[in-house]
């Protein structure tokens, strides 16, 4: 039956009310929710221990039942391949998501905080989360011997900690052995469970990172609004003297005239529906208000902070539907963190005493103590100066102390009440609440905050004028949902994230936000479900690899922390000799396969001073020199061409790479000219080669081709490859580091492209969300327009010099690219189309690094700039001179022919010929170099980094698998009107009726017949014509019978209740369409 909950242990119905049970040890009565089958043998209270002991037979039955569930609901090797129904069932740590029906970003109840979108997911129920932890669903506690338990209790009483640790280790060993056996029963192979655990942990980490990034975004966005509302709340009530606060706390005086003049301070927050910014805003309000109040207090540096921090509660109309429930909610929410026995009844009289005991009186006592300390210090100073007149001044000082103490003015700490969904509140309940708060505002300084999502006159529609006159209103406008969506896009794409959102997933988020719900909370929910479905529906993800040793530190110029970017590659379980630690800016080669980087340190000064010719590229081994040929083109971008391998040679695995391979590598001559500078580094590091061989020798994968490893990278099959083997493979380490470099530098390219496109085209309306949509749709109009403007119109107002000045302001982009790309390690890939993208990534990283270093020439002074540019173009000039010599010879021959012909030409014709052949002034070296540089920036960075699909990048974390996106979309595509339309028109498909056809016929359902006739009419339909058509289709006769009339009226009433049609006032016997109905 609906509404009943079933026990997850024995499938019995759980009682809705708490049952009384008896603790078997202390015989005390306790409350316990139990199922109807009474499966528990005994129960312990909290004083005797929280463990619930169950029968042995029941535990064994539970394990078999959980095994059956996993076998029916899993596939492949993941262990948690979950369907839509399985996710919505709320099992295995994935909540159904009912708390998001209202669209709020943060839930209102404390009890549901664990099920919120950004709470930590619950522990997987049917298998342990780690190999060492114990899950209560596994019957491990009854494995321990009773003698061991008794011995442990005696040792605890004696206080011998060493023996307690020994017993705990013995218990862990017993539990571990039993767990391993049960894991093998559940999953077969232990590695399968291990990778399932890694997928779950990676999913939790992604959700945690998403939560933290969104919280940072809200803090940045709501700074102005937070300051306005905090200043309004902190100074909402005037200061009162210390004696007045004391008399109010002791209930010696009532409400004064000044209190009646000052109304209840009320802030109106105009927000869109279901805005998550409101909840995030009021999480930061108390601390901000506390700092402001503390600064206005006397002795502000010494007053306790908790006395100035305002208590804040949120009231929801669903929980506060009556006045009594509203008052009790306020009282319980404010006093729940204090001693409840002092305030047993939920009434405002107790609430006023609560405020006096915990805020007013402690504040007065603390101020008096601080005042006494200050007076004592002053007296000591005066006694030293004036010892003779001491007796005469004592009487005067005592009178002055009383006067000063009475003159001290204090700021009372307000109590904030947030009213959510103001339009849905009952006006009578809200009016009574405001009258009650107004009566007690001289005892408790209440501050209200209304969250309004409609128009400004909503407050006058809900509340009468007399109630509104009791409020001191201040309007505050929060940012719109479009602005919040723009900020969300910046945080997801311009900040370093552990995942990459694919084009397909982004387009779904964008179009649903713009066209469907316009709610940021729903967008975040969809994104979170994309992450969950990705890990549950697919195989082992790239994010589940242990990349803790792969760290790239890429800081912006705005960051306070300094330091170069580093990528550390340290395989697990390695000795100190085999540690691979590559830092940017050092030329140390610890591993023979590592690539040496720049000899200078990676600092901004050294980057500017270094020259392009000093760039060095070393290969991982001589083995790779045979497979790659590097050449330098005119654009100074290193391109790698794969050489044809010998037919006799095979691609060897790490185990087959012997020392004999190096004998054949000494004769290699196809090396780039830049490698001439590497020989010194190789000679210096030749002594370390033998150590590197020994350190990596025993950790190579036996009987495993490296090609097979690469094939398994997009979705790692954990039955064949273990994570430990992957982490110790040197070539995979190189590949992973290059992919991390590519992923970390992609936001820099996007930000640079946006800067160029927005400022160069002077498009103020350009947004990141729109730009990403064009990139996702592969719309190249903006890119082609920008490229044509740079190359074909160099003499326009927006000249090359203007764009170069713009790029100089974006200097930090190029410095960050250098930091990221200097740790590149060349990767040896097989000659196959499957691995061409890996070579493209390396070439692209090298090109970007070269372009970034070339950019340093544009930052030099004019004299040095011209020298460096001339040196760069010198090679091009030599080639041009050869071509010019050939052209001059051809022109000389042509001129001789023309001179012979010009003898008979007229003067006019000769002048026209001279004007045509006037040589145009050649561009300067600076323009030539700049044009080529900008062409490389636009074509290489923008074209190669942004527009290609992310699927072509191996091991990039994408959420656009067809099955996953379809499952996620099915949860958030709520097209109610379209569903009703389709079901009524094609009712035959839904009912699966064999006697009917999928078109209008008399055997169809009455609702379908009348609905199709409604769609064929215009905006209005006559009732009698509609009835006549209905009867003609069923009987073939236009005369309606009483039976047909009753059936037709039932259909019409159903359409009216669904708000598809309504009666009209002007036209009698007519109905008007309300909803947008279409034929399909």
UniProtKB/Swiss-Prot annotation:
Q: Give a single Pfam family match.
A: ORC3_N
Q: Where in the cell is it found?
A: Nucleus
One molecular function GO term is:
DNA replication origin binding
For bias type Acidic residues, the affected ranges are 662-671
Q: Which GO terms describe its biological process?
A: DNA replication initiation
Where composition is biased (Low complexity), the residues are: 672-688, 875-896
Q: What would be the name of the gene that encodes this protein? A: orcC
Q: Say which domain of life the source belongs to.
A: Eukaryota
Cross-referenced PANTHER family, in alphabetical order? ORIGIN RECOGNITION COMPLEX SUBUNIT 3 (PTHR12748:SF0)
Q: Which family does it belong to?
A: Belongs to the ORC3 family.
Amino acid composition bias (Basic and acidic residues), ranges on this chain: 651-661
Q: Which organism is it from?
A: Dictyostelium discoideum (Social amoeba)
Presence of the UniProt keyword DNA-binding in the record: yes
Task: Point out the signal peptide segment.
Answer: none
Q: For this UniProt record, give its keywords in alphabetical order, as a comma-separated list.
A: DNA replication, DNA-binding, Nucleus
Q: How does it assemble?
A: ORC is composed of six subunits.
InterPro entries linked to this entry: ORC3, ORC3_N, ORC_WH_C
Could you tell me what this protein is called?
Answer: Origin recognition complex subunit 3
